[in-house]
């Protein structure tokens, strides 16, 4: 148990927005899509610096996450890493504009290198499950995967900008499978045909089914078990892939990594632990580019305290993380 704190091809469709806020976001995305990458990253980095200066929940949550995941790192280094992560956070959301709104070929031209490309080959006729964490430019990772051949993307419909996101992903040639029983059946069929399936593995599943608490950086994280079940049912291989953002807006480097052993285990905890270990291996390459602002530990084992609480200052965030670490250590004795 746990407790919890559209059109393919052509240009993106722009139906009337639900409110002026969404209209403004759409307009900014359209404007940003024309800007060069160096300017987008410059604006994004500046935005991240501003977020780091003003006490806010994003800043606090990122520091709590880092302090929980890197318990032996000094407070000063955690704050430095958090500030770097916020600058990368800003770049992530500025570069989404051209990735969504430019032609896929233009976005793919930003890829400078692919490491581990042999893992993407499907010479044996088996399906391929590609896990892309919220690391670097995950939208570009999805575009690269779709460019390799028939691809289905496991997709959570969004409250805002959903048609824009759907249209961008479909223009890449991918099909979208919603997070429903029907969507899961669609993924199974794709894998049985020897196609690729893309999944964001570090989203906290909703509800009490289809997930277990498994260690992520040594902390219990509510983790999906869908990947192991898909792999066992279809016989598909599993790998990890992400797009690292290169310095000075030089483009991106794709990394393909083998999945840890046991990721297809029939034991849900073993499989989820292996999945989270694979995420850790990816994050180790460029930890500042992980989405540390995401409330990954929002869902908690019953009887344990909430994570994202307390004051917004750095001192308060570090104190919250220290208290949680102390409680976890005491409960394990």
What are these regions (language model features)?
Residues 105-112, 156, 173-179, 216-218:
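Short, flexible loop segments at the rims of nucleotide/cofactor-binding pockets, characterized by
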Residues 2-6, 10-16, 54, 80-83, ...:
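Non-catalytic C-terminal accessory region of glycerolipid acyltransferases
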Residues 18, 52, 131, 155-156, ...:
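A generic secondary-structure micro-motif detector
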Residues 2-132, 137, 162-167, 171-173, ...:
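Membrane-anchoring hydrophobic helices of lipid-metabolizing enzymes
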Residues 124-181, 193, 206-212:
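Catalytic core of membrane glycerolipid acyltransferases/transacylases, capturing the structured
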Residues 60, 156-159, 220-224:
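Active-site metal-coordination segments of metallo-dependent hydrolases
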Residues 27, 61, 140, 164, ...:
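Short Gly/charged-rich anion-binding patches and loops
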Residues 105, 113-116, 140, 166, ...:
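Short capping/connector residues at structural and topological boundaries
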């Amino acid at each position: 148990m746990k407790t919890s704190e559209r059109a393919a091809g052509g240009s993106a469709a722009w139906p009337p927005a639900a409110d002026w806020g969404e209209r403004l976001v759409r307009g900014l995305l359209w404007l940003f899509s024309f800007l060069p990458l160096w300017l987008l990253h410059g604006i994004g980095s500046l935005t991240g610096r501003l977020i780091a200066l003003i006490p806010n929940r994003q800043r606090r949550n990122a520091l709590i996450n880092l302090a929980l995941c890197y318990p032996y790192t000094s407070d000063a280094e955690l704050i430095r890493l958090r500030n770097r992560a916020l600058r990368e956070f800003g770049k992530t959301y500025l570069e989404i504009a051209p990735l969504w709104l430019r032609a896929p070929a233009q976005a793919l031209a930003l890829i400078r290198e692919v490491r581990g490309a042999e893992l993407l080959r499907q010479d044996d006729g088996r399906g391929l499950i590609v896990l892309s964490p919220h690391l670097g430019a995950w939208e570009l990772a999805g575009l690269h995967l779709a460019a390799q051949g028939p691809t289905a993307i496991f997709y959570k419909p969004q409250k805002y900008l959903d048609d824009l996101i759907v249209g961008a992903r479909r223009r890449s040639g991918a099909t979208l499978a919603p997070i429903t029983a029907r969507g899961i059946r669609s993924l199974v069929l794709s894998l049985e045909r020897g196609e690729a399936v893309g999944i964001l593995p570090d989203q906290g599943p909703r509800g009490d089914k289809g997930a277990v608490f498994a260690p992520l950086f040594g902390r219990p994280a509510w983790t999906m078990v869908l990947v192991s079940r898909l792999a066992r049912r279809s016989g598909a291989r599993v790998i990890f892939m992400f797009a690292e953002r290169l310095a000075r807006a030089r483009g991106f480097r794709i990394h393909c990594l083998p999945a840890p052993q046991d990721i297809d285990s029939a034991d849900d905890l073993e499989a989820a632990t292996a999945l989270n270990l694979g995420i850790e291996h990816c994050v180790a390459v460029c930890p500042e580019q992980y989405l540390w602002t995401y409330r990954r530990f929002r869902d908690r084992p019953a009887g344990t305290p909430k994570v994202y609480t307390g004051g917004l200052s750095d001192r308060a965030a570090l104190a919250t993380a220290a208290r949680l670490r102390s409680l976890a250590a005491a409960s394990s004795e």
